[in-house]
Amino acid sequence: TIDDGFSSFYENAWPILKKNKIPFILFVNTREVGTFNYMNWQQIIELHKEDFVEIGNHSHSHEYLVDETSNVIKDDIVKSIEIFKNKLGYNSKFFSYPFGEYSLEFKKIIKELGFKYAFGQHSGVIDETKDYFEIPRFPINEKYGDLKRFQTLIKTLPLKYISILPKEKYLSLTNNPPIVKVKFFKDVKNINQINCYSNEGNVWRKSKINFINELNIQIILEEKFISERGRINCSIRVNGGFWRWLGIQFVIAEK
């Protein structure tokens, strides 16, 4: 997946992806299309004609919508849907949350507007048990895009879970830090070997884990999340140098 639709993607990555017919989703925020450093609609339509390319919706404004009211969120997304229909003749079934930030209310709006899948920016691997409106992705960019990291990421496997609490990933001042609990499926092996790290207190550190039973853990956060996004990454090493990986992202309310 590629977010934003920058012209640098069209100039550098598109020729390689096209030559090798590598399938991908390009998420575009409709307000920026055709402006400086962004692809135009002619280029987007060129990609859309290929059967291995999907064009996804990335909102209209790409603002911090999760902090806005329901009406503001809905108006922004509806505007992008109208532009999609005008330019491409349809609205995409794929959505990418701006900055990977979402709340239960944001998810509800996306479902009501007819989307089938929504992507965040919390790290992890897709599998059939995931919530289709909280699909994980590993960021690959100029800051997190070196080859060594990429080689690690392509050796990750899903860490399957039944549930993560709290369901609400949008934190207020009163529930930060959150009480984080994960319930795994019975076929997940070596839960006792799991390691989790978080950026609580704005410093990445290893988190303490309370093993409630063989399927349930509590990730203990001793300090509040300070940065705008609170992150937890958990992994279990498996044979062959692979890792089972689970990422959780929280959004910290401005007020």
Spell out what each predicted region is.
Residues F6-F106, K116, T129-P139:
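Metal-dependent polysaccharide deacetylase catalytic core of the NodB/CE4 family, i.e.
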Residues S7-E11, P15-Q42, I140-K255:
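Terminal accessory/targeting
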Residues F115-G124:
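Acidic, His- and aromatic-enriched active-site or binding-groove loops in soluble protein domains
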Residues T1, G5:
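Substrate-binding cleft of extracellular glycoside hydrolase catalytic domains
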